């Protein structure tokens, strides 16, 4: 917990190879159906996002024990959110809502283009299957425009 109090905690192999493959395929299939890509302003570029999705809520529950062990404290899972970014997408500078005191940003795969997450101005390149854990309500975080 001390590590994320200072900055953030980078976790290699947060997802198993099988979990990564499953969620990568799931996200691509969901994106192709594009069921909700126009429901929110943030998805105006044809992006796909999902809050409280069955697959990601399952992942959230499965990974809570792992996060508890990493942080050496008990956390309470609140919600899951995933987004498939497309060319020219960006993640505006923000902090998370109060219910997301601790954030785990996980790379579910992609096209291989380097696209860092910035946490309080520090560049973090998250590899597929890896995660970065940080205080989302306290740490300003964002991504610049995606060129991939």
Name each region found by the language model:
Residues 10-11, 76-77, 133-134:
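A structural signal for short, well-ordered beta-strand segments and their strand-loop junctions
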Residues 62-66, 81, 103:
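Generic beta-strand or strand-like secondary-structure segments
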Residues 144-148:
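Short, compositionally biased
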């Amino acid at each position: 917990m001390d590590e994320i109090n200072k900055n953030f905690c980078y976790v290699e192999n947060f997802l198993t190879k099988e979990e990564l493959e499953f969620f990568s395929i799931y996200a691509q299939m969901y994106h192709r159906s594009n069921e909700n890509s126009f429901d929110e302003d943030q998805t105006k570029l044809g992006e796909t996002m999902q809050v409280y999705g069955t697959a990601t809520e399952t992942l959230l529950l499965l990974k809570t024990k792992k996060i508890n062990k990493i942080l050496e404290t008990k956390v309470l899972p609140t919600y899951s959110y995933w987004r498939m970014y497309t060319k020219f997408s960006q993640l505006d500078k923000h902090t998370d809502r109060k219910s997301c005191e601790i954030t785990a940003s996980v790379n579910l795969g992609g096209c291989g283009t380097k696209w860092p997450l910035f946490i309080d101005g520090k560049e973090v390149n998250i590899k597929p299957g890896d995660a970065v854990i940080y205080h989302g309500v306290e740490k300003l975080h964002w991504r610049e425009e995606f060129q991939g």
